[in-house]
Amino acid sequence: MKIALLPNLTRSHALSVTDDVCKYLEKYNAEYYFETETAEKIGHKIKAVGLPEAELLSLCDVVIAIGGDGSLIHAARKAVKYKKPILGVNAGNLAFMAGIEKNELELLKELIEGNYTIDKRMMLDVTVKNGSCEKTLDCCLNDVVIARGEQIKLVKLNVECDGQQINDYYADGIIISTPTGSTAYSLAALL
């Protein structure tokens, strides 16, 4: 099995968790690769083979995001373009979407042996139009926030889904969410 590792190196424990993940993958004879830039940053501490993003994601069978929920969301935008499944490994204290905690790395054996199921999540493709100006955003796993920016008055928002008009809103902004994002938004409010 070929695995793309996408660690969030801004997280304090990400490098040590990445090192531990690599050791388990080696133990179970899995090949793992990093993005070129990441491999250059960590190559002095971890055996790291780097590939350009497109080659990495085309080559791999699965993507492992190491960090928190934000790391997984960021990695999901990359993985979806190549139709690759993604697994989150929590490198911090709290991650709702991580499939594995840092003290459960032995479960990587199940991944490598093919003993897993894939939970398909809805993602949003968003295009923002303002007059003749149009901007398509990356896919998003959680939600998209459209805000009025620095304007003082309310903005008119016309919301469509697959070309079908949903509604017009006059508001400061709007949050459009997937089921994953709405759950995260609700849980975050409790913390």
Question: Would you name each region that the model predicts?
Answer:
Residues 1-62, 74, 102-119, 128-138:
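ATP/NTP phosphate-donor binding region
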Residues 8, 64, 68, 90, ...:
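A residue-level signal for conserved active-site and pocket-lining positions in enzyme catalytic cores
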Residues 14, 70-76, 182-187:
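Short glycine/serine/threonine-rich phosphate/pyrophosphate-binding segments
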Residues 63, 86, 174-175:
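Short, well-ordered beta-strand core segments
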Residues 74, 79-96:
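Gly/Ser-rich helix-loop-strand patches that form or flank binding pockets
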Residues 79-84, 102-106, 189-191:
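A glycine- and small-aliphatic-rich helix-loop capping segment at beta-alpha/alpha-beta transitions
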Residues 93-172:
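Catalytic core of DAGKc-family lipid kinases
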Residues 115-117, 121-122, 174-177, 182-191:
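Class I SAM-dependent methyltransferase SAM-binding "motif I" and its flanking Rossmann-like core
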